[in-house]
Amino acid sequence: MCPKHLLYFRNKLNAWRDELIIESQETLDHLRSEIRDVGDDAERASRESDNILELRTRDRYRKLLNKIDAALKRIEDGSYGYCEETGEEIGLGRLEARPIATLTVDAQERREMFQRQFRDDH
């Protein structure tokens, strides 16, 4: 991958990372304020349900941040944009759509097919 593309994806990943960190902080701030402002039991139950959803979202953000950090490390070590299974280049279109991709479309489809077969066998 050329340096221009690497810079583009580094910037895209860093912007995505910053956005997720801000959203995570907002979620945390919201959860803290929710804890203080609880009324009756029905309201508490409703808020707890909402908080569970927010915590799940926060966990997804954490996992996504880990994948973004891994992609940034691959940019630094020169392996970004190459399939971890086949070593082939991952298409720019795929990386544009999913900059954290580690597999080509074909390799991803093979992996998903294998996982479906394994799941169906058990």
Language model features with spans:
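Residues immediately within or flanking Cys/His clusters that coordinate Zn2+
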Residues: 62, 80, 101
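Amphipathic alpha-helical recognition patches that constitute DNA-binding helices
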Residues: 8, 85, 99
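Short cysteine-rich clusters marking metal-coordination/redox-active sites
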Residues: 83-87, 104
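Short functional micro-motifs and their immediate structural scaffolds
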Residues: 90-91, 112
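A generic structural signal for ordered secondary structure
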Residues: 75, 87-89
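Short Cys/His-rich "knuckle" micro-motifs
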Residues: 93-97
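Interaction interfaces in information-processing and related assembly proteins
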Residues: 1-77, 114-122
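Cysteine-rich micro-motifs
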Residues: 101-108
